[in-house]
A protein has these predicted regions:
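Active-site catalytic microenvironments for nucleophilic, acid-base chemistry
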Residues: 30-34, 123-126, 142
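A conserved catalytic-core segment of Leloir-type glycosyltransferases
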Residues: 44-127
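Conserved acidic residues
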Residues: 132
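N-terminal subdomain of nucleotide-sugar transferases
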Residues: 1-79
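Short, flexible helix-adjacent loops and helix caps
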Residues: 16, 128-129
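Conserved small/polar residues in nucleotide/adenosyl-binding loops
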Residues: 139-145
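Short, hydrophobic/amphipathic alpha-helical packing segments
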Residues: 24, 28, 114-121, 141
Length: 145
């Protein structure tokens, strides 16, 4: 069975500001579950509706450096399953709290999504998932490949 991990900044039905969320919400469901183990990871934004947040399942947490001269930061990993797809959420109150997933502060956005990218890669051994394919969606998600 091949494994795919979609990495995105937003995904329907959890959070949507544009077309990326629609694609990320629809595409993973279309894979034949007999041949593909498809999972999605997005940030755990505080603005995700409570109807979903209340059903997120705690998986694990760890602390991670987000750069030199910076204290290690908390990374929580939550999970939710729907329509045969497993969704993971990267939790960090410093970066993902607010009324919207994005801000107008470019420096903060760069730091936030650099942190997210590193957290995604760091969580993989902890959830025992080694993807064969990692499609990254959007310019600020620049996982090293």
């Amino acid at each position: 069975m091949k494994k795919i991990l979609f990495v995105a900044s937003e995904c329907v039905p959890f959070i949507k500001t544009g077309g990326l969320a629609d694609v990320c919400g629809a595409l993973p469901k279309e894979f034949d579950k007999n041949y593909w183990d498809v999972r999605v990871v997005i940030p755990d934004y505080s603005c995700i509706p409570e109807q979903y947040r209340n059903n997120f399942e705690y998986v694990t947490h760890f602390y991670m450096s987000s750069g030199p001269y910076v204290q290690d930061k908390y990374v929580g990993v939550l999970k939710y399953e729907q329509d045969g797809v497993t969704y993971y959420f990267i939790d960090n109150q410093e970066f993902f709290t607010g009324f919207s997933p994005y801000t107008s502060d470019t420096k903060f956005e760069i730091e936030k999504y650099t942190f997210f990218d590193k957290a995604v890669l760091s969580m993989l051994p902890l959830i025992d998932f080694k993807p064969d394919i990692i499609p990254v969606s959007y310019t600020h998600l620049t996982l090293p490949t």
